[in-house]
Amino acid sequence: MRDPEFWHNKWAANQIGFHLEDVNPLLIRFWSDLAPKRSEKVLVPLCGKSEDLIWLANQHDSVQGVELSQIAVRSFFAEHFYTPTVTRLNAQHELYQFDELTLFTGDFFTAPVESVDLVYDRAALVALPEEMRTEYAQRVLQLLKPGGRILLVSMDYVQTELSGPPFSVPEAEIRTLFMGCEVRRVYQDTSIDPHLNKRTQAGLSRFAEEVWVIEKSE
């Protein structure tokens, strides 16, 4: 992944304002829109130490996550008093396994992830600059089985008003990135995101948090 030091430094300095302490209510509300089955395998790209992993593991037999930072993954298991089995796969990746959870550390684009039926993306696409997002979408679709579904949470604002991350990913770009898939917006909230500080909010002329259901063709 390009500029990995940016994220390594964020975790090392505990500058993780993007981390939610609780399960994302949008996940709880909209996951059922994917018509998920317990046996279907789930992928969470750029998962951090998200509480969403726990929620998903209670719904599914296999949840894979990929996270660049070892600090994040080790913190996740330590904070939940889990003792994972750790395997060094190669110079770039480690594998952490505990019950339904399988987490890889290292670059998402090269991690040896198994193909999956479902993808949950709350903080991956919006964490990437525009020049990386096409490659990211291609990688996700490569890992997604035919007929697989994605629940995507995105943000839409005037990019020149905020440097990001999180970055703005407007509707037109999402439809282009996932061209050939069925793309449906199932939610749009135009109130300012409570995770943005007041100074940032004051500089935005508009803001929308959006949820998308994306289905890969059979």
Swiss-Prot record:
One of its GO terms (molecular function) is thiopurine S-methyltransferase activity. PROSITE patterns: SAM_MT_TPMT. Its main location: cytoplasm. S-adenosyl-L-methionine binds at W11, L46, E67, R122. Signal peptide: none annotated. Its EC number is 2.1.1.67. It is found in: Cytoplasm. It catalyses: S-adenosyl-L-methionine + a thiopurine = S-adenosyl-L-homocysteine + a thiopurine S-methylether. The keyword Magnesium does not apply. It comes from the Bacteria. GO terms for biological process: methylation; response to metal ion. Keywords: Cytoplasm, Methyltransferase, S-adenosyl-L-methionine, Transferase. Pfam families: TPMT (PF05724). CDD domains: AdoMet_MTases. InterPro entries: SAM-dependent_MTases_sf, Thiopur_S-MeTfrase_Se/Te_detox, Thiopurine_S-MeTrfase, TPMT. Gene3D superfamilies: Vaccinia Virus protein VP39. GO terms for cellular component: cytoplasm. Belongs to the class I-like SAM-binding methyltransferase superfamily. TPMT family. HAMAP family: Thiopur_methtran (MF_00812). This is Thiopurine S-methyltransferase. The lineage of its organism: Bacteria, Pseudomonadati, Pseudomonadota, Gammaproteobacteria, Vibrionales.
